[in-house]
Amino acid sequence: KAAQVLSPALQQYESAFRRAGEKYGVDPDLLMAIAIHETGNGTSSAFRNKKNAMGVSPNGGGPRSFETVEAGIDYMARQLARNYLGQGLTTIAAIGKKYAPPGASNDPRGLNSHWVKGVSEYYFQLKA
């Protein structure tokens, strides 16, 4: 199903999403849904220029750079396992309140208000 939802830019990393998900106990479809939403399905400059497939922006700074796309996926899976799922935030809505809170200082254009809906839509497409 992922091949029908992921753009070619992200399709080549499907196995990395699956490996990271298995390694940390995170649903790979959730990782892919977040990546699709955060990167405009592989079109964002953060993805193209910084190998950041997950929208990681520490402390309100700009997008974090990674050595490889796979390293960024692994990092985000570990963070989700430790700081979200491991703390009982197990739904997309619960994760979104912490991961992309509307009105956050690093969200000047109000895009976080679309995070839960966007990630949920991609997640259910991947699960269909």
Summary of predicted features, one role per range:
Residues 1-128:
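Catalytic cores of secreted/periplasmic lytic hydrolases that degrade extracellular macromolecules
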